[in-house]
Amino acid sequence: MVKLLHLLVFVVSLILSCEDSSNNDYGTLNFDMRLDSDANGFYHLSLSNDNWQTLHRVSAIIKDKDDQPVENFWMEWDSNLYWYLGDILGYVIKRGLTDELVYVSYDTVYITGFNGMEVPTSNQISYSNSKGELNNMIAPVRSMAGDTLYLTARWLGGNSATFSIVLD
């Protein structure tokens, strides 16, 4: 009985002495879209006419309550836009040398089997570096011109922020 009482006291004191590590230990989180915004708060990204995808970096800076950078801060990202791969992703040209040491192309192999594969327009996860910087790449494609990409960032405690990016 005494052992049971000691065990109970130990377990209760252990439970009461534990800290809640889910508290928001950060002070500020500032996003930098690196885009101009209009009067309605929509950001505008000009799509490339020379490439299928337009790559663009979105950043955020996270600092604690003492204005120090927070390292290894986890952030999840998602977007409302996706695109689909066709049947052929690309090709490889096999080249060799002749007896005269001249390059010749003797075969082309097509990389297939990706038909219908869904491709997101945003990376999914990022962690802050030692400077508190978080980075995410978005990559809309030309066929999305005129659409609005809604980029959502989610982090600790169920917090989130959504940014509207018009694809021009």
Residue ranges and their predicted role:
Residues 18-168:
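The feature marks long extracellular or luminal low-complexity segments
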Residues 1-18:
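Sec-dependent bacterial lipoprotein signal peptides
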